[in-house]
Amino acid sequence: MQLQFRSWMLAALTLLVVFLIFADISEIEEEIGNSGGRGTIRSAVNSLHSKSNRAEVVINGSSSPAVVDRSNESIKHNIQPASSKWRHNQTLSLRIRKQILKFLDAEKDISVLKGTLKPGDIIHYIFDRDSTMNVSQNLYELLPRTSPLKNKHFGTCAIVGNSGVLLNSGCGQEIDAHSFVIRCNLAPVQEYARDVGLKTDLVTMNPSVIQRAFEDLVNATWREKLLQRLHSLNGSILWIPAFMARGGKERVEWVNELILKHHVNVRTAYPSLRLLHAVRGYWLTNKVHIKRPTTGLLMYTLATRFCKQIYLYGFWPFPLDQNQNPVKYHYYDSLKYGYTSQASPHTMPLEFKALKSLHEQGALKLTVGQCDGAT
């Protein structure tokens, strides 16, 4: 009788956990829907659930959700100058790596591999799960056979965000000195080299970049501009989230076609279907209540797998710097701040608060001003 009672209790608890998980997923799907998406792919959710062991909280000490006052946040997020003492906390970094491995393995999840798909296979979009795409021949040709980061380990990694706080930072030389440099969304580097550096080992490319930065390739001039940018990568990893939303399908195919037609020397990677929700699951477990992780946070989470020390540059989601000077949203364009909108899928100030906490504990180095030696 006692055994039967325990069995019923276990079954009830299991149902409760499943209900709470799907309630959370429904909430994020509704939020994403407000910004143009529809939801998450079931297979990705199921895969995440199979690995989501609870991790030890090391980011937010409070058990309650972090609340961010957006009135004048840059004042509250002052970080010591680059020249001040910062020491890497190797113990904490290793603990975070082990925690993240309970949710995902960056070596595997960084890209779908050729052996797992074939031309014509049907894939449900992560944010438009009622919509599907067929794996094209071009996409299949560009899928890697093995992970581009298989057995890779680096002493120091730089992750370069795109905030205007990089302007006049003089961080280019310091960034280029790192073992592995990650950049976001094909951001231009040549004309900003003094502040952002030139070295690129991995660069992300959201499909929306083709619309925003290359005018949807409306003519030969814009196609040539994109082609030049791709050629400049010269063997780097080009990380394209191809399976997120239906709206990116044509743009991904355009880029794939250009790469193949012009024999561009890049190593393409297309993140796994479960990656985004696995990353979000890790941060939620650590009480960082993000809606959808930004590219920068995704890259940091992945980098913990293969980087001993991680240095962040250009992560600053506020319109004023620490001295109350105006800061451009991106260092290279005139895009406006949009994270305060209810429709925005991102919670950048909340992410920054978590990263700042990790900086203060020595798990990562966050540079938001001038670099050492900058003049």
Swiss-Prot record:
Q: Which Gene3D superfamilies match?
A: Glycosyl transferase family 29
The reply to whether Manganese figures as a keyword in the UniProt entry is no
GO cellular component terms, semicolon-separated: cytosol; early endosome; extracellular region; Golgi apparatus; Golgi membrane; nucleoplasm; perinuclear region of cytoplasm; plasma membrane
What changing residue 60 to S does, per the record, is:
Does not affect autopolysialylation
Give the record's membrane topology.
Single-pass type II membrane protein
Residues at the active site: 346 (proton donor/acceptor)
Q: In which pathway does it act?
A: Protein modification; protein glycosylation
Matching entries from Pfam families are given as:
Glyco_transf_29
Segments on the Lumenal face: 24-375
**Where on this protein are sugars attached?**
60, 72, 89, 134, 219, 234
Record's PANTHER family? ALPHA-2,8-SIALYLTRANSFERASE, ALPHA-2,8-SIALYLTRANSFERASE 8B
Physiological role:
Catalyzes the transfer of a sialic acid from a CMP-linked sialic acid donor onto a terminal alpha-2,3-, alpha-2,6-, or alpha-2,8-linked sialic acid of an N-linked glycan acceptor through alpha-2,8-linkages. Therefore, participates in polysialic acid synthesis on various sialylated N-acetyllactosaminyl oligosaccharides (alpha-2,3-, alpha-2,6-, or alpha-2,8-linked sialic acid), including NCAM1, NCAM1 N-glycans, FETUB N-glycans, and to a lesser extent sialylparagloboside (SPG) and AHSG, which does not require the initial addition of an alpha 2,8-sialic acid.
This chain's protein is named: Alpha-2,8-sialyltransferase 8B
Provide the species name. Answer: Homo sapiens
Lineage in the entry?
A: Eukaryota, Metazoa, Chordata, Craniata, Vertebrata
Gene that specifies this protein: ST8SIA2
